[in-house]
Regions:
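Acidic, metal/ion-coordinating pockets
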Residues: 23-383
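Active-site-proximal helix/loop capping residues that flank conserved catalytic or ligand/cofactor
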Residues: 21, 65, 113, 121-122, ...
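Bacterial N-terminal signal peptides that target proteins for export
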Residues: 1-11
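Generic structural microfeature
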Residues: 18, 62, 118-119, 143, ...
Length: 536
């Protein structure tokens, strides 16, 4: 059927109006239950200088190469994605140890470059990030390839900005950073800290003016203060909370996600133990995201998943030859594992809301099983080699402190064997006798972060140093029994040696979190170091 000229003009006019309307706003995602998120947000908080985990158990949590591999693999199944970080990122502590400044800066460089590889979009700093000074922070910020956001800071901020607006699938997302980098109520030198709430409210107006309808806040501040602020400032669909400051190697437990009004609040465990994934599904024009995860059940699922991981590890340990676990206890753990699996199935992810936009949340533990990003892995190897080559020379003259009068020096197992042959033979069958080898194969034997747990008498009078380890490599007799020079001279004087070290020594000296899993048990590990002539 042909259209009259008048009808044709009406149709053309209608099409023109429709096209104009489409140009004025982002295309809406069709109604229904989409399987592909409009935007996938990868979240890392309080990475705090953790390049990879350090310990003596398999498949530990952490590793920037594993996190990068995970992000790369999951990015492919989303329409668009962002990587965001908040809290201390580059350094483990608020201050650098003078002797470790070079290797700590090189580690920060490796972290910054790896974040760039992961396509970091924005990050907000914690106190630790000023550890090397504002100039180094500015240099490392450039290495990440992403802006540093801190709307409430001025002065020596390392080049921080207030907001960033990005576009994803036709939607503008506005990101603001708020940092409260205070340690003992003091900010880093030259940094002025303005009111966080006022800055967050002002940033929202700035984001609105820029056309952002999805608003994300990166907060680096104490969680309690962050939660109180979120309760009083509306308009942000996603808030990512990182710590204000972090110290040392201790790993935090996961913090469950929560809703404050219509705002999803997310915080991942420190040291890159996990990466949170927040999927935003946009349907229609409503940018209020409903809970598509069932957060109450999500918390229970996460608890169950951690329990399942613990049981898998315990069962694997118990199934090894020579295990001291009784068969009935092993069977009980297997039954527990099946029960936990059933509970996980019963607490599965619910169906999405029937209409409107919604989010889904998950926390992915970062483990070896995720694989390793090749480029990041090579960078890590380069970092370790650089440190090894540097420290071998820089600390070549570092010798152990002299032994005070009336005290014992370390002799080494080669001297102990002359009287304790049976014990020495058994020791050679244990992992303790091979502790130094992995450092050599991985070029970490001169790394100040590593060597202390792999040698005997480290940094003790008459013991070893990072470069002076002759005769004292590996975990030898004197780690547990104490230095033995006076014992060798007077073997009948039982007061000169610790004959039966307490089990607590294992945990206090070496086997403590995060170097072992939280389920590590000295009672189960103890039998592995007992044998002929050695308590067995």
């Amino acid at each position: 059927m042909r259209l009259s000229s008048a009808s044709a003009r009406i149709v053309i006019a209608a099409l023109a109006c429709l096209m104009a309307a489409m140009c004025k706003r982002a295309p809406a995602t069709p109604a229904g239950a989409p399987s592909t998120p409009t935007v996938r947000v990868f979240v890392v908080t309080s990475l705090a200088g953790a390049l990879e985990p350090c310990g003596c158990v398999k498949d530990m949590l952490g590793g920037i190469d594993h996190a990068a591999a995970f992000i790369r693999s999951r990015r492919e199944s989303a329409s668009s994605s962002l990587v965001l970080a908040a809290g201390p990122t580059l350094f483990m502590d608020p201050a650098l140890k003078a002797e470790q400044r070079s290797q700590t800066l090189w580690k920060a460089e490796a972290i910054a470059a790896s974040l760039a590889d992961a396509k970091l979009v924005a990050w907000t700093p914690g106190v630790n990030d000023w550890a090397a000074g504002p100039d180094e922070l500015a240099r490392l910020r450039q290495a990440t390839g992403a802006p540093l956001l801190a709307a409430n800071l001025s002065g020596q901020t390392g080049g921080a900005e207030s907001v960033k607006i990005v576009e994803a699938q036709g939607h503008k997302l506005g990101i603001v950073g708020i940092a409260v980098p205070l340690e003992s109520d003091k900010a880093p030198a030259g940094v002025e800290v303005a009111d966080a709430k006022a800055a967050l409210e002002a940033a929202k107006q700035k984001l609105d003016a820029g056309g952002a309808r999805i608003r994300i806040a990166l907060l680096a501040m104490p969680r309690g203060a962050a939660m109180r602020m979120i309760e009083s400032v509306s308009g942000y669909q996603l808030v990512i909370v990182g710590k204000a400051v972090d110290r040392g190697e201790v790993n935090d437990a996961p913090t469950p996600p929560t809703l404050v009004g219509e705002t999803l609040v997310v915080q991942t465990p420190n040291h890159l133990q996990g990466v949170a994934v927040v999927d935003l599904f946009v349907r229609g024009d409503d940018m209020r995201f409903q809970d598509g995860s069932g957060l109450a059940r999500a918390e229970k699922r996460e608890t169950l998943r951690r329990r399942l991981e613990d049981l898998d590890r315990l069962i694997s340990e118990a199934e090894r030859p020579g295990s001291s676990v009784r068969p009935e206890d092993l069977e009980a753990r297997r039954k527990d594992r099946e029960a936990v699996k059933r509970d996980i199935e019963q607490n599965g992810v619910p169906e999405p809301p029937a209409a409107g936009s919604f989010f889904r949340y998950e926390l992915e533990p970062v483990r070896e099983s995720l694989g390793a990003d090749a480029a990041v892995g090579e960078r890590m190897k380069g970092y370790y080699k650089r440190v090894n080559d540097h420290n071998r020379t820089a600390f070549a003259d570092r010798k152990p402190a002299p032994v005070p009068a009336g005290k014992s020096a370390y002799l080494g197992a080669d001297k102990c064997v002359s009287c304790h042959g049976e014990e020495h033979k058994f020791w050679q069958s244990t992992n303790h006798s091979r502790a130094y080898g992995p450092l050599e194969t991985q070029e970490k034997q001169f790394n100040l972060d590593c060597v202390g747990c792999h040698v005997t008498g480290y940094d003790k009078p008459g013991g070893s140093t990072v470069t002076h380890v002759s005769g004292l490599t590996n975990i030898q007799c004197e780690v547990c029994h104490g230095p033995a020079s006076r014992h060798a001279e007077a073997p009948n004087d039982k007061s000169l040696i610790l004959r039966a070290p307490p089990k607590s020594l294992c945990a206090s000296e070496c086997h403590h979190p995060p170097h072992v899993g939280k389920d590590w048990n000295v009672e189960q590990a103890w039998p592995r170091i007992l044998g002929p002539g050695h308590g067995g």
